[in-house]
Amino acid sequence: MQLSKLAFTSTETTGFDGIVRKFTDIYMAVFKMEKNLTKEEIIEYYVNNPCMGGNIYGVQQASHYYFGKDVKDLNLVEAAQIAGMFQSPNGYNPYINPNDANERKNTVLYLMKRHGYITDTQYQAGIKVAIKDLLKGGTTSVNEYQGFIDTVVQEIIDNTGNNPYDVPMDIYTTMVKSKQDIINKFYKSYNFKNFKDKGKELEVGIGVINNKTGAIIAVGAGRNKTGAMTLNVATFSGQVKRMPGSTAKPILDYGPAFEYANLSTYGPFIDDKTPYGGGNMRNFSGGYSGFMTMRDCLRKSINTCALQAFRLTTNEQKKEFAAKLGVEFSEETLPDSYAIGAFNGVSPVQLASAYSAFGNNGKRSTPHSYTKIIYRETEEEVKPVIVTEQVMKPQTAYLIANVLTSATSSSVHVSGTSIATKTGTTSYDTTQLRKFGLTSSVIPDSWTSSFTSDYAMAIWLGYTDGLTKETVKKKHYLLNGTATSERIKIQAWLGNKIYEKNAKFKHPGGISSAKVELETIPAQSPSDFTPSKLQGTFLFIGNTGPSETSQRFAKLTDPQDLSYNINNKSLTLSWTSPGTPSAIDTDYLTNWFKSNWKIQTDKYLKKRISYNKKNIGEFGFAIYLTQGTSSTYVGWTKDTSYTIDMNNYSGLYDGAIIKSMYSIFKSNASSGRKVVFTIGEADITANDVTINVSNQNVTLSVGGTYNELNKSSISSINYKGNDIKGDVSSLSVTNSSITDGSGENVAPSKVTEKAGTYKAIYSVSFTYKGVNIAKNVTQTITVE
């Protein structure tokens, strides 16, 4: 009946199915097997069918695998070892669990003595022999694909309750050999030279998911794998999973905020003291940066901003969003610590599956390592249940991908492919660190989770045995700086080989791009004069972008009610002020910061006032005297009147312009208001000016074409040694007369009809500093 149980029926032991299985065992044993097989054949079938550890089946294979000999050549101790493995072949595998295997061997020897099969002398001699000393070579050869096999086996057990090592079946896996071979090569060849003992005990768990199907295409189940069904660091199956650190931020913080709160890549957030757990949230850097955009918050992994984003959505919204990504919580209320990934936990495969939705326009499929199994005895085909669903809006997925693309190291590069990356680091409790005399630079986990539009890959770096006296003594722990540097190298090593070329994230529509003036809350468009360093372009869901233009640097309002008074050489100008602009008005700013900044209001109000004093200055007015279209700057004042001593200015002026203007930041000065008057005396006459033309003497042929002078013919206008051509206005050139050698007038069109010398006189007129000037220039024309 034991044989029928192992070979032909299910493993169910409880309930109605258990009763059915028991009667089936009896039926198979009594009516089928014992009628058709001899007892010797039954025993032979029994010992040559079961799994004996890993991929070893039957006692003959086991004899060669463990002891390098045929089963008929085994000694008493070796035979006792194999006999004891039937109950738990992997648990009593001497390569994997030598101590448990030795105890099991001793139990078998004791039972053999008790039932009279061996003597006490044989028993005493047998228990003194350590089974590890009898093993072939003392080590095991592990199938290079064992990690993926283990992943598949565990999933089948979880899904069906049947162990492929016990129940014969054909399994169709999702493994892509070329991708798995890359990870296998990484395990064999990567040099962990920056770690103690070259990282001998260091583990790297890896999970790679096909975004569109959910298929697990490759895993890194462990660098130090010693056999089948040992610790799998790709899935942490049956183990406590690891804290994800900041890789949780897209899942619990920013993803839900995009989905439910219409967060944009602008945000914004205030990186400063944020109440948390009876104190304040701390950043890894130990400092704060103040105003930050959402893009920078996630890209730089700022904890305070993550906590603020976490609080933008309800508890139910966060739990629902995470659950759809395969990260479920039993807690009714998620504590604030989860905002920075301080929870147990996730595995690389689980994290890669969650991130696959970000690369697939918000769609996620159930992660799976096999597509179907066929039971050999019944030929029954069973497929895993795979659900594909839209777990978030396509816009949410795209925004996360867009932001995280800018967080990818330049060393990770695949031609034509956009790669998005989020890293994560966890920390030990300070009490635990103090216990072993360690600093906060010692960390338990270092993560990299990245994705393209095709694949998602999560990498975990760490030690599996935690902090103990032994591990601390051997320095088997991560140092944050080393781990951070190494994870970038590992991501590049793997990503540059696993990711395919020309994979771009698909823009889903429903997203608008808009320029924003930084430090505006809510987002406002920059004005024409906003400094470029205070501008940025960001993405918004739908039409939630800026609807107003910021007035902080907007063009100032002109003064009103201009008047003047002339007293001899004294000119007094007066006007009405439009009022202090809100951008530098302390009362306005106080109310604005209280209403919008929320965090550390007084601190950032003072910072803004200080910025204004250094970069904008005081509000006042600039005064200019005008001469036609040209103007001369006179001075600046905070007052609403200004007196000019005209003895200091030469020339004739036709008015003045008053502009609202800051004392330092002048770009956004108002257009200005003009008051008209006449003051001063002209200090320029035609006699003071010399006009030069480029073709003052010209030679033409009879029958040729004569071109009259025009404005472009004027090469320079000299006044007091300076060329003032660029400063004049209303420049014009007109023909006065053309005469031949006898003094007769000649029309311009007749000049080249016969040979001779001609004199052309042109009148050049212009306005300079309010004075109108007219002067003749002469051109000599020779016709041959």
Where are these regions (language model features)?
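Conserved catalytic neighborhood of penicillin-recognizing serine enzymes
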Residues: 1-13, 139-141, 263-318, 335, ...
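Active-site SXXK
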Residues: 42, 112, 183, 214, ...
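A penicillin-recognizing enzyme superfamily signal
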Residues: 173-196, 208, 219-221, 227-240, ...
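Non-catalytic structural connector segments
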Residues: 119-173, 179-202
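Serine/threonine-rich, repeat-prone extracellular segments and beta-strand-based repeat modules
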Residues: 722-768, 773-779
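Short, well-structured active-site flanking segments
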Residues: 57-60, 120-122, 258-277, 315-320, ...
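Soluble, non-transmembrane domains of envelope/secretory-pathway proteins that act on or interact
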Residues: 423-710
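Peptidoglycan glycan-strand catalytic modules in the bacterial/periplasmic cell-wall system
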Residues: 1-118, 224-227, 301, 311-312
